[in-house]
Design a protein with these regions (language model features):
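A charged N-terminal "starter" segment
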Residues: 1-120, 311-314, 338, 343-344, ...
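A non-catalytic, amphipathic alpha-helix used as a structural packing/dimerization or gating element
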Residues: 43-51, 177, 214, 218-221, ...
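Active-site-proximal beta-alpha core segment in soluble small-molecule metabolic enzymes
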Residues: 62-209, 311
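Active-site loop/helix belt of alpha/beta enzymes
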Residues: 162-319, 330, 338, 342, ...
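Internal helical hairpin/lid segments
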Residues: 283-302, 370-424
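C-terminal accessory subdomain/extension
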Residues: 307-316, 320, 338, 342, ...
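Short polybasic linear motifs
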Residues: 326, 331-334
């Protein structure tokens, strides 16, 4: 159940709340707790943290995972302890949470304008690298910092974008003009170049990868066009130039195209760090990222210019691997259904949906809990939603007490995984969800379509996977913690405690 930090909750261990379970942590059987309930598997979480850290070490790049996925300082700390260089965030409020939590370095993938906010970003204690994408932005930020009498310059990254993309300078020339404006500002210091390839396409076939690679080469053009002397003030303060890109879908391509520039020792030029910002990997999911992660595309750390395991000739359509799931609810790429080149890239991440199965390169291994490929790397889904059947008004329909107030629906509906009967001796109900799928969500209800002959009853528990963890986690102030997936346990989980989020 979701709770509001401004609304006190009843002190009962029948729900996960700050007043109840969170204040007196002790193991509680999940079947004794109120639904809906979001759980996070700590074993899977630690697996994902360690896996991504190991992959980055092998690839020879740094990682500043996007903290907006979880907004949970406890999880950020796990990532930092595993070797993350910093944490990426999207808003000044999120940066304030990170500063309070002691995060040493933050990439602010956005821009602030209020003088007091900018002064706080520039304050000692946490190194904040804020994005700027236009000369006008630089002018406004510079003037605001002057009014605020900030005690030190604010480090900024020039954001490079793309026509029809999201934010970011639309050409190399525009980006270079932004860099010149930063260099001329007494209140800013140029720290590097940033971009986000995931705003351009969601396709993982050869055409989609070509769009991503061309964009990433543009980032290199911006970095080279700026030239080493422009970074001297930043370098002289003991920092390294930052070249950053990479969400959770194309981080392999970032390494392939940009990886050779990672040179924190300065052996080939100015000290430079290539920093990935992938965030969703830490939670992973049962649908969207399960299909699109590079680890499902038979790709591992790749040297610059490598193919990353993409087969341009053969593709196969894949689903979720579980009966009746929402795996075929895909996002489209470009609005016309085709990629026509760099300038024809889609307007945004998941801008529209297609009913066709998504095409991924042959050689993938999307089945299994982590979509594990032959690289030996895999992510595991950490999140599960538990809901009760509250109505069986028709033979082929069950209503669950979970809705869009509790879970995401922007990139697919929850995925039915398993059913349990809390009051029965043999609680597991094999087969009752065969062929089932969630067809829609209201605020507090999910429409579960199933075989009219299914034995699912009112009062049964349904275990659901999620698609797109970011927009599920943000609905929960407390997430119940368990260990070991239900698939491996064979018994209902025991809730050990909870993780607090700071949305």
């Amino acid at each position: 159940m979701t709770t509001s930090p401004s609304t006190p909750s009843a002190p009962a261990v029948t729900s996960i709340t700050k007043v109840g379970f969170g204040r007196e942590p002790r193991p509680v059987p999940l079947i004794d707790l109120a639904t809906p309930l979001l759980t996070i598997d700590l074993d899977a979480l630690d697996h994902n943290v360690v896996t991504m850290a190991a992959w980055c070490r092998e690839a020879g790049v740094d990682l500043a995972p996007h903290g907006k996925t979880t907004m949970a300082p406890e999880i950020w700390r796990r990532q930092l302890d595993a070797g993350a260089w910093g944490i990426t965030l999207a808003t000044a409020f999120q940066v304030a949470v990170a500063r309070e939590a002691g995060v040493p370095t933050v990439v602010l993938a956005g821009t602030a304008f209020a003088p007091a906010t900018l002064a706080a970003l520039a304050a000692p204690g946490t190194d904040v690298l804020m994005w700027v994408d236009s000369v006008e932005t630089v002018r406004l930020v510079d003037a605001a910092l002057a009014r605020a009498e900030a005690e030190r310059p604010l480090a900024v990254l020039v954001e490079f974008g793309s026509p029809l993309g999201r934010t970011g300078a639309r050409s190399v020339r525009e980006a270079l003009l932004v860099a010149e404006a930063v260099a001329a500002s007494p209140h800013l210091v140029l720290a590097g170049v940033a971009g986000y390839e995931g705003a351009l396409t969601h396709d993982v076939d050869a055409a989609g990868v070509a769009v991503v690679d061309e964009y990433l080469r543009g980032l290199l053009d911006v970095l080279d066009g700026i030239g080493a002397p422009a970074f001297d003030p930043w370098l002289s303060s003991g920092h390294d130039v930052v070249l950053t890109a990479g969400g959770s879908v194309y981080f392999d391509r970032v390494v392939a195209v940009l990886g050779d520039r990672h040179d924190p020792s300065g052996l080939q030029g100015p000290r430079t760090r290539v920093v990935l910002r992938s965030g969703s990997y830490v939670a992973h999911d049962h649908d969207l990222y399960r299909r699109l992660t590079p680890f499902a595309r038979d790709t591992g750390p790749t040297t610059a210019g490598g193919a990353g395991g993409v087969d341009a000739d053969v593709t196969v359509a894949v689903g979720d691997g579980s009966a009746g799931s929402q795996a075929d609810r895909e996002m489209g790429g470009p609005t016309d259904g085709e990629l026509t080149g760099f300038d024809g890239a889609a307007e945004g991440f998941g801008a529209e949906r297609s009913e066709e199965p998504h095409a991924v390169p042959a050689g993938s291994s999307p089945t299994g809990p982590g979509a594990e490929a032959s690289t030996g790397f895999s992510f595991l889904p950490t999140l599960e939603l538990w809901a009760s059947v509250v109505s069986r008004p028709e033979p082929g329909l069950a209503l669950l007490n979970v809705g869009r107030r509790d879970t995401s629906d922007d990139e697919g509906f929850p995925v039915p995984l398993e059913a349990w009967r809390p009051q029965a001796a043999d609680r597991r109900l094999p087969g009752v969800l065969d062929g089932s799928h969630v067809s829609g969500l209201n605020d507090q209800h999910a429409f579960l379509r199933l075989d009219p002959a299914s034995g699912l009853q009112v009062g049964d528990l349904v275990r659901l996977g999620v698609s797109h963890p970011c927009t599920t986690i943000d609905k929960w102030n407390e997430i119940a913690t368990v260990r070991g997936s239900a698939d491996r346990r064979g018994v209902p989980p025991v809730v050990e405690g909870s993780i607090t989020t700071r949305f």
